[in-house]
Amino acid sequence: MEIEKKRRHTSGRTLLWSVAAIAVIAAAGVVGGKVMLEKTVRTSLEQSGAQAASVEVDFTGHVHLSDVTVPLENDQTLHIASIEARPEFLFLSGMIDARDLAFEAGPMHVSVPSVLIEDAGINRAFLAAASGEADLTPAERVARLSAGRIEIASVAVSQSQQGIDQTTTYSDVALENIVDGHVGRYFASGMTSDTEVAPDPRADGDAEPVSVKLSVGAIEGEDIDAPFLTRIYTEAKPADGENAAQQVYGPVTAKDFVMETADGRVTYAEMSSDGFSMRLADEPFLTTLERLGALSDTEALLPGDEERLGLEAFLLLDAIAKGDLQISGIGLTTDAEPDMTFAIDRLAVTFDDLVLGFSMDGLDVRAGDDSLTVRSASWTDFSLAPTLAGIREYLKAGPGAPDMAWKAAFLPGFGTLSLSDYAVNMNPGAENGFDVEKPLNVAVKDFSLALQDPVNGIPSDIRMVMNELKLDLAGHDDNEAFALLKQLGYQEVNISENIALHWDKANKALIVEDIGFSGDNMGSVSLSGVVGGFGEAFFSGDKALMQAAVFGLTGRAVALKVENDGLFARALKLYADRNGMSVEQAALTLSMLPSIAAQTVGEGDPGVQALIDAVSAFIADPNKLEIAITAKSDQGIGAPAFMAATMDPASLLQQVDITAKAD
C-alpha cells in the first residue's frame, strides 16, 4: 500500500508538471508572429530548463516541437517525442497533442503513448502560474488549469523496489469539464496490474515468489477537487482551528474486479462510492510521508521508533471526514478447496469523522453438503476517535513502551455488532465437505453485542442479546453439558440469552439490569442486581489498582426470577430415576431441603420463612418463583461481612431484607 501511495503521488506530480511544461511552450503563441513566436518558445524553454531538438511555429500559430526533455524535481526527467500545441487565439481554443511521453524516477518508469488536451485554457494567467512567474501556492497553480477534455490512450507504470515488481496499465483514460482545477467527469475503459513479490531471503525453506494479477473493467467518476487535494499534500491545517472538510472525490464506480493468485481468484461485480470528503491534517501529507519514508529506510531503528512510526501513520486517518464504499457480487474460489464456493451479495463501509459502519448481506460459503450462511451482518458506531486521541497523548508524552493504561486508552469505541439468520451445517465424512471431526449444526436467528460509553477505552455499558440459538446435540456426547441435556430428553435445543449492565458513575455502582436465559420446553431464568463501590479504578487500565478496588465492592441488591416450562419436570424425573424412587417421592424429598437448610442459617426469621415457603411451593407445583434480597444499608454489604458469613451464616441475615413468592 505504501508503494502504491508513493506511485500515485509521483504520477500525479508528473502529470501536473508535464501539462505545465507543455503549456508554457504552447502559450508562447499568444505573442503573435512566426519569428516572434519561435523566439518566445526558445526563451520559455531556456527559462524552464527544458530542451528540444527542434522548434517550429507555422503561420497559423501552431507550435511544433520534437525530442523534448523537461527537467523535474529530484533529478527526475520527462521525455516527450513530439508536441503540437496551439494557445488560445481569437476564436480558436487552446490545444495540446503530445506523443510518446516517458518518465523515469529511479525504480519507476511511466510511459504514455499520447495525450490530447482539447479546449485547453492556455493563456497568460496559466502561463504565469505554470512557469513560476506568479507568486502562487501549488494549489493555486493547479487551480489555473482548465480544459474541455483530456484524452490519454493508456498509462503504463512499471516499478521494481524492495523485491516487488509491479506493472500497472490504465486504458482509454479521459477527463472532461476541467474548470479551475476541478475535474467534472473522468473515466477509463479498464485497468490491469501484474505484481510479483520475491521470497524473503531470510525465510526458511524453498519459498516461492508470490504473483498477483489484477484487472478492473470500466471506471467512471465525477467531481475531483484537485486544488484541495494539492492542499492536503502541501499544507497543514490552519493554526486558528478553522479546518472545514471539503469533498475531494464525487461518485465513482468500477466494474468487473478480478484478482488472481496461484491459490485462487477473487471477483467483484461492482465497486462504488458516493464520494469522499477530507480536511487538512496536522502537517502536510508530503511531509509526513517523507518523514515516515526516511525512518522506514533506516536499517536499525531505535527501540520504540518502529511503534511510533506506525502510530504517526495511523494519525493520517484524521484527514478523512466522510466517505463510503459499496461492493456487490463478491465471489472467491481457491485451488486448495476446489469444491468450495464463497459468495457475498453486498458489502458496504461508511466513514464519518472517525466513526465507521460496516454491513454485509448474503454471505454463503459451501463445500459439498456443508455450508455456512449469514443473511445479514452489521457493525455500527465503531469509533477510532478515542484511539487517535490516545495516540496523540502518547506521542506527546515522549518515547517509551506504553503501559497498560496507555494501551487501554488506545482502544476504539466498539459500537454495536449484529447478525441475523446465521447458520452452520458441517458433518464428518461429508463428500467434498470441510473435513470436520465433529458435527456442527447450529443456527442463530438474531445476535447483537453493544459495548458503549467507553471510559479510558473500557466500555461502561454492555448489552448482548441472542435469540433462538438452535443446536443439534447429536455427536456431542463428550461434552458434559450436552450429555446432560440429552439425558434430560433433549435432542436439540432452542435457547435465548440476554445481558444488560451499565456503570452508574454518580452512585459508584454497577447496575446489572438483566442476565437472562430462556429455552423452548425449558423455561427462563433472570438475574438482576446492584454492586456498590464500583468506582473509576475499574476503568483505569491499571491492573494493580483494579485488583485493590475489588475489596471495596459491596452487594446492594439481587433479584432472581425463575419460570418453568418443562425443564424442572424433566430434571425431577431424571433425579428420581437415578435414585430409584418415584417422581412424587423425589418431589417430596426435594421440598424438605429448604427447611433443613434454614435450620443452619436462621430458622424463624420472617424473610427466611418466606423463602422456604416459596421454594417449597415451587417444587410442589413448578410455575413461577421470584426472590429478592436487598441490603438494609444503602452502602451495601462489603467483603468483611461475606467473609464472616462463611463462619456464621446467620450474621448475614441481620443485614438484608428477603422477599419471595411462588405462583
How would you name each of these model-derived features?
Residues 2-48:
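N-terminal type II signal-anchor transmembrane helix
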Residues 29, 33-663:
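Glycine-rich, small/hydroxylated-residue low-complexity segments
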